[in-house]
C-alpha cells in the first residue's frame, strides 16, 4: 500500500489518513490543501488504490473519538489515490453522492460507527464496521434539495471560517515580524510604558480543551 515515505513534491494526487483528519477537511469535496503526491509510476503499481468520482475515502484509524467516521467525498473525476490508513467506500446505487457526504458528517450516523470501534488511545475503523451502519435514503429529489440547502448554508460558514484562518495566519506573521524587529533593534522599546491592566482568569472549558487537543493532533497528522 501507499505509505508516507512514498510522498513526493510533484506527481499523482493522493489523500491519506492525515488529510482526512485535517481540521480544514469539510468532508464533502476534494480541496487543494488536502492533496499530497506520489510518483507517476504508482498508476501501474497500485491500481486498486485509485478512486473514482463518487467514492469516499475514510480514515481507518482515529486518535480521538470525534474523528471516528471522518472521510472525504470524491467530487472530481481526476486521477487520485487513496493513501495510507484509508478505506475506499463505493455506493452500489446511483443516489446523489454528496447527500451521503453530508449524512456521514451527522452525529446520528457517526454514533453507529463510534459504538462499534475498538481501541483505547487509537480507534480502529474497519470495512465491516462501516458496512454495518444503517443509512437513510430519501427520494432522489429530496436528496438534491438537502444538498442544495446545506451547500448554501455550509458554504457561508466555510467562507467565514476561511477568513478567520487567514486573519490568524496574518497575526502569526505579525508576531514573528514584531519579535524579529524588537530583538534586532529595529524597534526601540526602551522608553515604551506598558499600561496597567487587570489579568482575568478564565474558567476552564473542558469542551474547548478537547477541541484544542484534537486540533493539535490533526495538525501533526496532516504532515
Regions inferred by a protein language model and the residue ranges of each:
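Hydrophobic pocket-lining residues within nucleotide cofactor-binding pockets
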Residues: 20, 130, 183
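Short, solvent-exposed loop/turn positions at domain surfaces
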Residues: 1-2, 44-45, 119, 156, ...
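Non-catalytic DNA-recognition/assembly elements of restriction-modification systems
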Residues: 1-5, 9-10, 132, 136-140, ...
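Low-complexity, Lys/Gly-biased intrinsically disordered segments
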Residues: 1-28, 39-46, 61, 214-219
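Periplasmic-binding protein-like
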Residues: 109-112
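A short glycine-rich beta-alpha junction/loop motif
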Residues: 79-86, 117-145
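A short beta-sheet element
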Residues: 16-17, 42, 46-105, 124-126
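Amphipathic alpha-helical coiled-coil/heptad-repeat segments
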Residues: 137-223
Amino acid at each position: 500500500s501507499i505509505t508516507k515515505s512514498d510522498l513526493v513534491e510533484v506527481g499523482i494526487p493522493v489523500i491519506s489518513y492525515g488529510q482526512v483528519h485535517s481540521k480544514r477537511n469539510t468532508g464533502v469535496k476534494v480541496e487543494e490543501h488536502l492533496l499530497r503526491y506520489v510518483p507517476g509510476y504508482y498508476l501501474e503499481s497500485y491500481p486498486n488504490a485509485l478512486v473514482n468520482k463518487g467514492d469516499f475515502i475514510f480514515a481507518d484509524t482515529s486518535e480521538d473519538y470525534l474523528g471516528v467516521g471522518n472521510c472525504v467525498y470524491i467530487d472530481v473525476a481526476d486521477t487520485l489515490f487513496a493513501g495510507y490508513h484509508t478505506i475506499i467506500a463505493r455506493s452500489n446505487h446511483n443516489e446523489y453522492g454528496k447527500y451521503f457526504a453530508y449524512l456521514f458528517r451527522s452525529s446520528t450516523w457517526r454514533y453507529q460507527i463510534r459504538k462499534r470501534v475498538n481501541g483505547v488511545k487509537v480507534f480502529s475503523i474497519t470495512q465491516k464496521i462501516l458496512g454495518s451502519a444503517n443509512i437513510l435514503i430519501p427520494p432522489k429529489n429530496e436528496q438534491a434539495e438537502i444538498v442544495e440547502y446545506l451547500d448554501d448554508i455550509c458554504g457561508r460558514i466555510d467562507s467565514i471560517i476561511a477568513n478567520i484562518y487567514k486573519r490568524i495566519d496574518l497575526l502569526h506573521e505579525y508576531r514573528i515580524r514584531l519579535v524579529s524587529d524588537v530583538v534586532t533593534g529595529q524597534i526601540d522599546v526602551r522608553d515604551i510604558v506598558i499600561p496597567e491592566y487587570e489579568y482575568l482568569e478564565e474558567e476552564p472549558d473542558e469542551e474547548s480543551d478537547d477541541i484544542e487537543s484534537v486540533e493539535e493532533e490533526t495538525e501533526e497528522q496532516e504532515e
